[in-house]
C-alpha cells in the first residue's frame, strides 16, 4: 500500500524524500516505485531514471559536470528534459553522499516542474534532514520508513487472516465493533501460534535482516554489525560528535533504559560527560531515528503532572544485543520484558499512525501521585488513552488509569484502548486490543 501512495505523492507538487533509520528499506522502496511505474502505470522506461550516489565515480563526474543527469536524460530518452510532454521520473539514492548537489537539484525542480518528478533517499538523516530542509524549503514532502510492522509479519505467516488496523479505524471514525468480533472468532484457533510469533519478534526486533536471521547467533552478528556501521559511517565523521567513545557509551546506556524517564543529569554523572554534550548526542540519536523522546500530555490541566519525557528506541532487538538477554524466557525472568513490550507497542502505534491522514501526536500521561497512562494519541479533536499490558487477561486495576484520564478530560475522550495478548473485545468504550490488530 505504501508504493501507490508514494507514487500519488510523487505526482503531486513536492519533491519526495524518504527518511528513516538505516536498513529500513529505502533503496528497496525506490526500486519498487520504479517497478510500479513500469508495470502498473505503464510509464515508458525512457521516462524513468535511477542513480545511486553511493557510486564514487558518479559523484566525481557530477562534481566536474553538474548537468550530467540532464545529459543522461537527453541521451537515453532521445530528447532534452525541456522537450518532454509527459513526466520524467528521477530517483536518487544515497543523496547524502553529495550534499553539495542539492542546490543543483533545486534548480532542476524550479526550472522543469511539473515535468520533473523527483524522489530522494539516503541513510544519513542528519545530512538529508538539515541540508534538504534548508535547500528545498517549501518544496519537500518527507516519508519516514520503519522496520517491518508486526502486522506484516503476522500476514506473512498467517496469509489467510484479515488483520485490519483497529487504531486506524478509530482515528478515521470507522470503528465497527461487530465486524471485529467476527474476526476475533476466526482467530481463536490460531491464538497460541500468534503468541509464539509475538514472543519471537519481541526478542528479534523487526529490522528485516535481524528478523529473518536463521538463529540467535546470526541475528546478534547482524545487530552488532548494524551498530558498528551506524557509529562508523553515520556518526564518526560528524563534527558535532566530539568524542566517539562517549557517544557509543551513551547509546548503550539509553538502550538499556527504554521506557524510562529521561534524566540528563543522571546520564551526565554516570558517564562523566557534560550535560550539554548529553543533550547534543541525544539530539543526534533522534535525528538519525534511533531514539525517540515522548513528551507528557498536559492539556489544560498542568498542575500535579510529570514534565519529564520518556525515551524509546526504534527497534526492540538492540536491547538483547546490549544487555546480553537474548531469549524470551531470560527477558521475562530479568523483569525487563515489560518496558520492551511497551517500546514495541509504541513502534507499532507509530507505524499505524504514519498511514493515517489525521497526523496524530503521541504522548504519555503521569501525575505526581503516580497515576499513569502509557500513551495518549492526540488528534485535532480527540484523545485516545492507551494502556499496555503483556498478559492475556486483565482486571479492573488495569483499567483505573484509563478511566481516571477520561474523567480528567471528559470532553476529549471517547474510546480508550488496552493493548494486551487476549482476545479482541469492546466494552464500556474500551477496546481490548491484541497487538496484531494495531
Where in the sequence are the language-model features?
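Hydrophobic anchor at the beta1->P-loop junction of P-loop NTPases
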Residues: 18
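Interdomain motor-coupling "hinge/lid" segment immediately C-terminal to the ATP-binding subdomain
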Residues: 131-247, 251, 255
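Domain-level recognition of nuclease-like catalytic cores that cleave nucleotide substrates
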Residues: 421-438
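Short glycine-rich substrate-engagement loop in P-loop NTPases that contacts/grips substrate
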Residues: 51-85
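Pre-Walker A adenine-sensing motif
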Residues: 1-13
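Accessory nucleic acid-recognition modules appended to NTPase machines
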Residues: 49, 211-383
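Walker A/P-loop
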Residues: 27
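Conserved catalytic/switch belt of AAA+ P-loop NTPases
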Residues: 102-119, 134
Amino acid at each position: 500500500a505504501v508504493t501507490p501512495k508514494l507514487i500519488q505523492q510523487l505526482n503531486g507538487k513536492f519533491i519526495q524524500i524518504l527518511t528513516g533509520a538505516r536498513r529500513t528499506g529505502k533503496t528497496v522502496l525506490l526500486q519498487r516505485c520504479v517497478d510500479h511505474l513500469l508495470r502498473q502505470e505503464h510509464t515508458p522506461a525512457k521516462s524513468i531514471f535511477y542513480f545511486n550516489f553511493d557510486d564514487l565515480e558518479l559523484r566525481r563526474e557530477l562534481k566536474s559536470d553538474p548537468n550530467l543527469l540532464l545529459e543522461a536524460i537527453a541521451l537515453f530518452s532521445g530528447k532534452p528534459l525541456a522537450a518532454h510532454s509527459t513526466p520524467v521520473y528521477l530517483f536518487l539514492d544515497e543523496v547524502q553522499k553529495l550534499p553539495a548537489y542539492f542546490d543543483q537539484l533545486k534548480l532542476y525542480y524550479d526550472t522543469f516542474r511539473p515535468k520533473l518528478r523527483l524522489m530522494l533517499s539516503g541513510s544519513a538523516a542528519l545530512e538529508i534532514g538539515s541540508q534538504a530542509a534548508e535547500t528545498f524549503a517549501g518544496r519537500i514532502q518527507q516519508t519516514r520508513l520503519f522496520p517491518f510492522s508486526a502486522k506484516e509479519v503476522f500476514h506473512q505467516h498467517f496469509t489467510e487472516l484479515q488483520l485490519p488496523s483497529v487504531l486506524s479505524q478509530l482515528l478515521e471514525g470507522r470503528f465497527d465493533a461487530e465486524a471485529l468480533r467476527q474476526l476475533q472468532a476466526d482467530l481463536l484457533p490460531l491464538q497460541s501460534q500468534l503468541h509464539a510469533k509475538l514472543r519471537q519478534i519481541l526478542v528479534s526486533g523487526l529490522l528485516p535482516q535481524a528478523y529473518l536471521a536463521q538463529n540467535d547467533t546470526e541475528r546478534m552478528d547482524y545487530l552488532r554489525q548494524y551498530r558498528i556501521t551506524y557509529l562508523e559511517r553515520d556518526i564518526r565523521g560528524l563534527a558535532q560528535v566530539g568524542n566517539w567513545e562517549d557517544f557509543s557509551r551513551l547509546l548503550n546506556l539509553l538502550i538499556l533504559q527504554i521506557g524510562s524517564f529521561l534524566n540528563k543529569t543522571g546520564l551526565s554523572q554516570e558517564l562523566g560527560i557534560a550535560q550539554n554534550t548529553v543533550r547534543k548526542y541525544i539530539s543526534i540519536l533522534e535525528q538519525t531515528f534511533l531514539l525517540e523522546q515522548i513528551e507528557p500530555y498536559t492539556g489544560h490541566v498542568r498542575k500535579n503532572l510529570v514534565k519529564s519525557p520518556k525515551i524509546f528506541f526504534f527497534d526492540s532487538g538492540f536491547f538483547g544485543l546490549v544487555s546480553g538477554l537474548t531469549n524470551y524466557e531470560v527477558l521475562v525472568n530479568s523483569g525487563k520484558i515489560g518496558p520492551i513490550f511497551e517500546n514495541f507497542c509504541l513502534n507499532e502505534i507509530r507505524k499505524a499512525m504514519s498511514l493515517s491522514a489525521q497526523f496524530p501526536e503521541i504522548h504519555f500521561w503521569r501525575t505526581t501521585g503516580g497515576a499513569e497512562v502509557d500513551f495518549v494519541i492526540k488528534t485535532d479533536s480527540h484523545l485516545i488513552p492507551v494502556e499496555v499490558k503483556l498478559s492475556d487477561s486483565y482486571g479492573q486495576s488495569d483499567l483505573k488509569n484509563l478511566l481516571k484520564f477520561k474523567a480528567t478530560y471528559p470532553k476529549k475522550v471517547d474510546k480508550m484502548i488496552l493493548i494486551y495478548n487476549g482476545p479482541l473485545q469492546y466494552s464500556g468504550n474500551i477496546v481490548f486490543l491484541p497487538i496484531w490488530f494495531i
